[in-house]
């Protein structure tokens, strides 16, 4: 049964009623436009249940012997004997614009001029303005529950100056309903192709149908059973067609989750393709993720910034003048929260400000939540972190006191706040403050670090972390030891890692205790936990790396490995994603110092180029590093054996490689091409080729392996494989990013016959 508002295809072959309806529409058009179209045949019929039936008929007609396609919209109410042509347009001459939104051929016909005047009158009444209509520049229409008209028009303002405006007008003709949804100043530069715009009614049947289509495609590809619930947000972008960005809720095995999909639509070709479909999280698209807006100076965002500046001027009796937007971020809350960094002049001096503006478009609601001076040259960011220039301003002292009070209450402690030493902030779902401060404990001054999560618009404040740092507060990116590895927070993290491992590997480890915990400030926090777990009744030592973003309720096991069992077989080599992480720089420096001492040399460490690790009874690190020898840069390789639980560290090998053999981008030969790691890579490439080409190659052996440091590692493998029992030589290129568990065959080709 047809859903109210939904478009449904109607079988039309050999049905005289649709021919008659099309002829009726042609006669109506000819009469109104003094034309001489001749109806030929119906091509397509859709219907929509409104207060009656709306028919969308696509048909062929000729004029002056030229055959073209037209579309007519005809409203029928049989009980009133009503038949009315609501829309009529040419669709065969590229007049159809992408995405369900179509250009109207005569923007200044009486009907559209009246709609534009209606929008201007509505604006004048609401804003006590005196705009006067001049002309329509462009009209587009979109089928919603009714018709949405997008009119770009020229009007003169109070000063007699001609300006460009955009109006969105929603019309339900059968109900005699007309509403101005939006009216705004555009300026002389109308938004260009490629801009992403919010769609006002994400659960309009059209967009629900698109979301259901994406879910069906995903279910079919992945053999899953998602069930659509609702759309949370829809954005659209004019491309060669229309790209829809839909955030939706769906049920997976009874659990509600959030997904994002990108759907490309070319309506005039009846083309629809799911470009992307991915899990976002259980709540990442609710009060949640902050995303960058691609065009911060689009008229919409400039208007928002001007609104914030005006609001500030009114409340502070100031005289700021808006210049431009520098950055715009948006966040889906109950409506949309915009974070705008803007430039404005104050008494002629250009300064930077930050504004937070809450918008609920469907209620015509707009409120400035926050407006503040950032500085004359905006603070440099450290990976999304911004230094706050005045750490002891009352606002930040109050935040710290709040954290100290909370800590005292939780720990039955008696810290007394002294002063803030440093404040950083990070835009998350709200703001995360990283405050380093001094406080006295039993009369002794100590250094602490706290993380406080604030959502101003919800009056929400939470201490995410509070810890003793000491006199050398850990810097961003540095790895620091945690003093109490078995506190409940870290035991819970370790159990989470063990459970994750058990699930993935079908194992049965049982957590016992933590031996050591380190943490590193990244975009969130990276925890390095050395733990004891029981495997088949035997105690073993494992290492887990867990990435936590508390403000997103995000927790992911990056790595879990056995390190402490002497029976462990020497294993595969693993690339380390961040070779210049302080931990690995310290190891490289240790190796250089050891070499200098043994050889009475004077090498000076510069940087790491590559780090690999190998699971043995402990860990062997293979570090390719740069050091200077008598002022000349050279490349060295070091092998360092580490057993962290014994505080054991030994340089097993240190040697000169060359002046450039290990530079990023340089290709080097791997000494053991048939080690299991490289055989596995070659098999992966062969399987990928077989799947794509419907081939039946069988891997035999590797002949040669080269590797190249890129954003990850590129492997160039020459291998032998049999094809219909004939041995041949192939070359493959495989990109590996171990830390993302990413592996992709870039190239696979036949080189020659192995028997020759």
Swiss-Prot record:
Induction: By wounding. The record marks 5, 99, 194, 288, 383, 477, 571, 665 as: Reactive site. Coiled coil: none annotated. Residues 3-96, 97-191, 192-285, 286-380, 381-474, 475-568, 569-662, 663-756 form the Cystatin domain. GO terms for molecular function: cysteine-type endopeptidase inhibitor activity. PROSITE patterns: CYSTATIN (PS00287). CDD domains: CY. The keyword Magnesium does not apply. Probably has a role in the plant's defense system. This is Multicystatin.
